[in-house]
């Protein structure tokens, strides 16, 4: 009988601990919601900023073409530049949607924080990859590659290279905005979780996983 009583007491204690943990998490979410209300206008503007940058970079690249006595070249002839246009278009759409999402007050939940965090990460890496690919193309256009006998092309198509360089520079400005947004969303997400107290580590009844050396 005493063993059954102990098991019941342990079960009740476990439920009480879980309830206390849930209450603490709800308090942290409420505090995070109050903080989010104060910074919501700033974050909304910050999320809208990449929209203008993406549209500018996309417009410059879409108009980028040149023809002379040596031939004709357009952005659509190069896969890296086409990827830059597509990535800027997608990021512009996400920037608009996320700005509206942030501007509308709504209760803070862990699931929403996870959603915004993951989307910020995806679009940050998307625009970063597009900028890096286009920058590599520009490097080859300006310097060539002697190992594969590629000659530089910007001496002949200077206007094309200058416009491409402008578009890539604007794209990296977008990258900086998305990195900052990723930091904000990651802070909001992980601040909702309470770290375990250090005094509980190694105490009686607590098992600590140890990895073999």
Curated annotation (Swiss-Prot):
This protein's UniProt keywords: Cell membrane, Membrane, Transmembrane, Transmembrane helix
Main location class: membrane
Ranges that cross the membrane: 42-62, 84-104, 114-134, 167-187
Record's GO cellular component terms: plasma membrane
Stretches assigned to the Extracellular side: 63-83, 135-166
Cytoplasmic domain ranges by topology: 1-41, 105-113, 188-213
InterPro entries in the record: CASP/CASPL (IPR006459), CASP_dom (IPR006702)
Bilayer topology term: Multi-pass membrane protein
Compartmental location: Cell membrane
Entry's family note: Belongs to the Casparian strip membrane proteins (CASP) family.
Assembly information from the UniProt record: Homodimer and heterodimers.
Identification of the protein by name: CASP-like protein 2A1
The organism of origin for this protein: Zea mays (Maize)
Lineage of producing organism: Eukaryota, Viridiplantae, Streptophyta, Embryophyta, Tracheophyta
